[in-house]
Swiss-Prot record:
GO molecular function, one term: structural constituent of ribosome
The protein's name in its UniProt record: Large ribosomal subunit protein bL35
A GO CC annotation given for this chain: cytosolic large ribosomal subunit
GO biological process: translation
Keyword field contains Metal-binding: no
Sequence segments annotated as region (Disordered): 1-26, 38-67
Keyword Ribosomal protein set for record: yes
Natural source organism: Albidiferax ferrireducens (strain ATCC BAA-621 / DSM 15236 / T118)
Family of the protein in this entry: Belongs to the bacterial ribosomal protein bL35 family.
Amino acid sequence: MPKMKTKSAAKKRFRVRPGGTVKRGQAFKRHILTKKTTKNKRQLRGSTAVHETDMGRMSQMLPGRGI
């Protein structure tokens, strides 16, 4: 059976941490920012981990990465 290919879109958007969790960027930070408070925009600045219910999909999109 051939190797599974990594999804290019997932490769650009996600990073696998050493512990096996997956790091992702925050959504809702691209446009229409005038309605959002300064506190809200500041909290959206950092990255966060992918939820455990989505980890099955992550392991399919990023095979062979220790997820």
